[in-house]
């Protein structure tokens, strides 16, 4: 498949294997603690290496270790994971004790990555290994299931975003709605959020995040902790570029004065003040023998602009953020929003796993610390390598193995620190293989986050102009996730590796940039633009040179100059010169080359070469579709293809530019629900349920993307002759009629393939194997006790037999599917080491699914319909040439849907069939001067057909010619997986709920159909109220109960005898006989003359009892029976 559908997933995991594991080991803070005997111990990871998956035979890793392939994991239900080997450096009292190397656990391996055995295999080798010939990888195998981590949208890293947010006022007293937010990210992808808040007093507070807690620190505390310079130098550094702004100058002086009042006079005092306030929060990260100075340094290092290494760089970047915040407060720059793709990036699977791995390693070393502290309480304890290995134990390895597998299996993130991600669930999903389009779309999906699903605002769902070329405008669900679950375009890719930008500062200095040390040499009064590179404030450039510097950098980037990464973004944001003072972004030159950015290729017209641009710089570029639209001196870029705005699925819609937009949205969803050829390696898969179209065809109309993606290897539909005519009456309301003869010849014939996993190892009788009693003949079971391949099985037929080797008993198991099924492949797989006999079987069932009434079909234009009738061929209309349509389509489906693309496809399909060619249906090929209708109409004329695709038809009933011409052509139809056999629900009798006495819900339980308010209203509107009473009461949960008319209670009536009541209430004469007749008596009123038998629903009695338990009484208004009957 000539499309990098999952390249960024694989590249990100390659980063994890090659560099990430080592980064994670180095990023884990050293554990410093003191044992009971007084020894000071320091433990730290020094190295980490990820190995390829191997068979777990208990042997050490050697060159002879057997490799574990993905196909084996799918069938055996295993996790495709490799061993993580780490080195732990241990120091005692400042002297090195040892460097311990140990396998810490297993980490799931992404297919086709550097850690996978499939890497580098040819197509033939992939087929031999049980994989698809075009396998691209990008997913994991966990417990036999394929899992993919979806792309997650995050704030752009290392970029200060100016925000106006009303909720900022709720942060504390005197807080305003203005702030500058930055998501600071290290090279190892460790991230922290920090926000600079503006207070109504003119001062500023810096919000720091540590382990999900937010701490507010005065800005100047942090600034003075970063530098040992005096207040005058600090003030000059912060005011550089805004010396004439008296308001800003007063703000800086006020904050410095506050520091004087708090006696924060130098760098050490500032660090100590910060350390004393954070000492409790970082107690497990600072050794007991270290003072507040070390705690303060830890906060500066791990919570403040962590992507910068030196304090001087942090000082200058904070100065930039302060100036940007003041510009926002004064209305000099436009506010920004994290909902804009310009300020977003994608968190890729490898980077997310790296963060989880780092935290798991941090948890392990903390567990070892606590174990050693416990072990040191014994008198004879001596800290040795053996003691550390014992402390590591088996439970620490499960932290990695089980933790990583749990994350991928459930998609839930269990974390203490939060990892600067806005959600804790929904990270991974099952990579469903309903068809190839569905499978591929998982890798191209990009999600905003589960947190935003609950928000009422629609801002996060909007399709913004900045998303052009990066986010597909039509490939998004039409339900609740609309606008939140998007898909990147086919040409979009994501930067996953770290770019070398170390030469950029020197290059900028050569081009005329003033560094912070040389800016004092700038001529007085010269206007300057700040230069920011990946959140690092490099210096200033004169406004007069800014444009020429930006052009030079772009030329160097396109020419792939080694000094600047070719995937970097270069943007010049100019000051607003508009007369109406329309605000722009904060001006400056921005160079962005971090990982996680979305980039796409365009053509640079000046250099006639392909250039990759990003979401930030695209806003300030002029990109045209047609060279004739180029504006001299302004336009420098052109799109490579007009369809660059569509995703993988969007590029497979024929003539999408002729359809209404919602129809393209529907097709993107329905294309992923189509029965087709999902895989070719059926023999090596163990999916619970898969769909297969038995006789698929390639479409008569193809797109450029169709050939590029090799979709003919996995076709999705059938070419059908479609007549647009109101003929049968069964084609109303989106229904369609199928030719019964076409159905009988296999039109849209499909099968459902299920794999049943029978694992005897999990049963209580571990001595059980598959085996049939040789003395007993069972025709439905083979000698090995397993079903016979190729045989058709029906409900309650015996399909496998087990034998208990301890008791000698045979046990038969009956077929439990309601539909008959053919037994396909029967496989015996190993469960693990030491298996004795056949215990784990995979049985493949093939269920035939011919199109029947109620099955769903759709064209490639979002025109979905239900098969309403299989019409006999002798009664269908036929053309002059004897052609009988396969499908009757109602003409009323066109006007409201405006799917002109389907009409063009009908004409073009007929022309393609008559000329024996495949025609191009790519978008934007035709225009107003060269229309598609005219092009294909002329082709039809050459073939002897009507220009508009109309034909003369004859009635199939009486053979008379129809007065009107019928629009007739070939359309590629898809059969969707929504089949009536999976959904129909009808019953006469069945199980009922023991409490409500109503039918249980659920199709699998044999429950009743759902009946709601709309159905009730429909029956009332038909004037059939008695049917309503009969169905919903008499035949559902009708019940009888006694109620007291006097007090209206349904619960106070109890059965009692007159004799007992007489003895309690009054004295009885000696000769008076006892009356033992039982009667219904109201316990509240103590009378029985107003107790009547009522007919009520059982669920009403249950509701009354439930409300009574909550001390709520229901009082009924009951008429006397004489009034009801009229007597």
From Swiss-Prot:
Keyword Calcium included in the entry's annotation: no
Catalytic activity entry: RNA(n) + a ribonucleoside 5'-triphosphate = RNA(n+1) + diphosphate
Gene3D superfamilies given in the database record: 2.40.50.150, 3.90.1100.10, DNA-directed RNA polymerase, subunit 2, domain 6, RNA polymerase alpha subunit dimerisation domain, RNA polymerase Rpb2, domain 2
GO annotation (BP), single: DNA-templated transcription
Description of activity control: Antisense ribosomal siRNAs silence rRNA expression during the elongation phase by decreasing rpoa-2 occupancy downstream of the RNAi-targeted region in nrde-2-dependent manner.
Highest taxon of the lineage: Eukaryota
Cellular component GO terms held in the UniProt record: mitochondrion; nucleolus; RNA polymerase I complex
Modified residues (Phosphoserine): 1025
Subcellular location(s) of the protein: Nucleus; Nucleus, Nucleolus
Phenotype upon loss of function: RNAi-mediated knockdown causes sterility.
Main location: nucleus
Broad enzyme group: transferase
Protein name as catalogued: DNA-directed RNA polymerase I subunit RPA2 homolog
Primary gene name: rpoa-2
